[in-house]
């Protein structure tokens, strides 16, 4: 399919928010990723989309330390309401550092570090994700133009650099609470996330 990913399977996926088609993709190293689609996404019109990085703690365990779970739910609801769209779910836990390192970083955050300081203290990158994987998925699905649900300007730039036309950025401000207030502020202050619109 592309130099980054191969499409390996698709199936129907009924969820709390409606029925999606789930597409499975695999990197050469065996790492798996999925995309959830609704409707005809390859008709040339801009497609509502979210690039979501795996977050076991937020997506599956309902942690209040981040806004990931509420963002995923809001994106799934928005795509269903639109009647067409795609959610790219990249298996890049903990901004790409992995689950165990994320737990280590959480421990350092409990001692007063913010999310960026904790990653650096562990000798890890602040953000190790590769959003080019999303471009490979869009390519397979025939998507060239998107309306992107994101607060992260890096996702926008990566898609533009890959030749995807980002016609609109749609802010995704959900899941704020007292437990993740500092985390969200750090994302704005140190990672450039667009949190105030």
Swiss-Prot record:
InterPro entries the record matches: GTP_cyclohydro_II (IPR032677), RibA (IPR000926), RibA-like_sf (IPR036144)
Transmembrane segments: none
The keyword Transcription is assigned to this record: no
Pathway(s) served: Cofactor biosynthesis; riboflavin biosynthesis; 5-amino-6-(D-ribitylamino)uracil from GTP: step 1/4
Highest taxon of the lineage: Bacteria
Residues given in the record as Zn(2+) binding sites: 55, 66, 68
Protein name stated in the entry: GTP cyclohydrolase-2
Gene assigned in the entry: ribA
């Amino acid at each position: 399919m592309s130099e980054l990913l191969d499409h390996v399977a698709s199936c129907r996926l009924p969820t709390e928010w409606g029925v999606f088609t789930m597409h499975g993709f695999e990197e050469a190293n065996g790492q798996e990723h999925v995309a959830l689609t609704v409707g005809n996404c390859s008709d040339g019109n801009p497609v509502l989309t979210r690039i979501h990085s795996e977050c076991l703690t937020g997506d599956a365990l309902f942690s209040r330390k981040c806004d990931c779970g509420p963002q995923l739910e809001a994106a799934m609801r928005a795509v269903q309401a639109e009647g067409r769209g795609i959610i790219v779910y990249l298996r890049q836990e903990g901004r790409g550092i992995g689950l165990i390192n994320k737990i280590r970083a959480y421990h350092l955050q409990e001692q007063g570090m913010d999310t960026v300081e904790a990653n650096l203290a562990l000798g890890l990158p602040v953000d190790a994700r590769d959003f080019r994987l999303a471009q490979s998925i869009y390519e397979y699905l025939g998507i060239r133009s998107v309306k992107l649900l994101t607060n992260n300007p890096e996702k926008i730039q990566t898609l533009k650099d890959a030749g995807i036309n980002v016609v609109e950025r749609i802010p995704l401000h959900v899941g704020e609470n007292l437990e993740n207030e500092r985390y969200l502020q750090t994302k704005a202050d140190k990672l450039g996330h667009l949190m105030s619109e």
